[in-house]
From Swiss-Prot:
Protein EC: 4.1.3.39
Gene3D superfamilies: 1.10.8.60, Aldolase class I
Family assignment from sequence similarity: Belongs to the 4-hydroxy-2-oxovalerate aldolase family.
InterPro entries named among the record's database cross-references: 2-IPM_HCS-like (IPR050073), 4OH_2_O-val_aldolase (IPR017629), Aldolase_TIM (IPR013785), DmpG_comm (IPR012425), DRE_TIM_HOA (IPR035685), PYR_CT (IPR000891)
UniProt protein name: 4-hydroxy-2-oxovalerate aldolase 3
Site entry (Transition state stabilizer), positions: R15
Top EC class for this record: lyase
Pfam families attached to this UniProt entry: DmpG_comm (PF07836), HMGL-like (PF00682)
NCBIfam families: 4OH_2_O_val_ald, PRK08195.1
Gene: hsaF
Positions with a binding annotation for substrate: R15, D16, S169, H198, Y289
Length: 339
């Protein structure tokens, strides 16, 4: 990390935003967004299908342009920013990591459910052997206690992960809950690995939670310009940078340039604004994986049921990423109850 940074920001608009865009990014959009973010000084830009390498499928939605092609475009466009990719073991495979690196990506971000860090061990080993920077995602971090989350972080760090993220996939964590988890990871990992935080806006706390994470010791923070992400979106990078400027935390990102990028480049690529509407609010309240939003809206329309109620029941069942197909079962259940 450069000495001019207190916090390294990763922009996930071109990965988490893919959920909101139903994975329909074009090469031209990726080129424009990467160029604008790079110009603003964003140090890391994540590019893949919303569900990571190999996510383009019937279950998750097909990409308009193959993700490896988009990674290559991003690498060719960025002058200073590093290009990162996300992969979920079992959805993506180890060969996908090799191809992404061959296309110029330099940061490998590996995500697992917060209780399943052990499935990432071989993938971290491969990434480190190939000289990639490594980041670990412990998703749905609200669903287990801080001390248990720290033990899972230790598994990732011992496998070669250089920064373990507390990932609030549902946007369900509230301030002190973020601080408690970040502090637990910082205490557990010490100098062995950094700690990061990835938030969502489903309770309107993306920026506030990110600042809480910074104050608790996080060194890497995710966000999406214009909140371009799943659910109500991620912590908006432009707002986070502005707050950091006001409290004296260095990000290396030009506030005015990132505000221009949000308004003039990212917004035109969005199908609509990411809103804190009823459905997104229910996800944060019930603790539902943020990428479920578009799937729930589709099944609610198909079966004539309430998408909000669908999401609340998904939360009660503690569904996790990869179980989107169970929304159909819940929709049918709701439909039967109405007969």
């Amino acid at each position: 990390m450069r000495s001019s940074w207190d916090i390294r920001v990763t922009d996930t608009s071109l990965r988490d935003g893919s959920h909101h865009k139903r994975h329909q990014f074009t090469g031209e959009e990726v080129r424009a967004i990467v160029g604008a973010l790079d110009h603003a000084g964003v140090p890391v830009i994540e590019v893949t299908h919303g569900d990571g390498l190999g996510g383009s499928s019937f279950n998750y939605g097909f990409s308009k342009v193959p993700e490896q092609e988009l990674i290559s475009i991003a690498v060719d466009t960025a002058k200073n920013a590093k290009i990162a990719f996300l992969m979920l073991p079992g959805l993506g495979i180890k060969d996908d990591i090799i191809v992404a690196q061959d296309n110029g990506a330099s940061i490998c971000r590996i995500a697992t459910h917060c209780t399943e860090a052990d499935v990432s061990i071989q993938h971290f080993g491969l990434a480190r052997d190939r000289g990639l920077e490594t980041v670990g995602f412990l998703m749905m971090a609200h669903s287990i206690a801080p001390e248990k989350l720290a033990k899972q972080a230790r598994i990732m760090a011992d496998a070669g992960c250089q920064c373990v993220y507390v990932v609030d996939s549902a946007g369900a964590l509230v301030l002190e809950q973020v601080s408690d988890r970040v502090e637990a990871l910082v205490q557990e990992l010490g100098s062995d690995a950094q700690v990061g935080f990835h938030g969502h806006e489903n309770l309107g706390l993306g920026v506030a939670n990110s600042i809480a994470a910074v104050r608790a010791g996080a060194k890497q923070i995710d966000g999406s310009t214009r909140r371009f992400g799943a659910g109500a979106g991620n912590a908006p990078v432009e707002a986070f940078v502005g707050v950091c400027d006001k409290i004296g935390v260095k990000t290396g990102i030009d506030f005015f340039a990132i505000a221009d990028a949000a308004e003039d480049v990212v917004r035109p690529a969005m199908p609509a604004e990411c809103l804190l509407d009823r459905q997104a609010l229910m996800m944060g309240y019930a603790g539902v994986y943020s990428s479920f939003l578009k799937h729930a809206e589709r099944q609610a329309e198909r079966y004539g049921v309430s998408s909000a109620e669908l999401l609340v029941r998904a939360g009660k069942r503690k569904l996790v990423g990869g179980q989107e197909d169970q929304l159909i079962d819940i929709a049918l259940e709701l439909q039967r109850e109405r007969l």
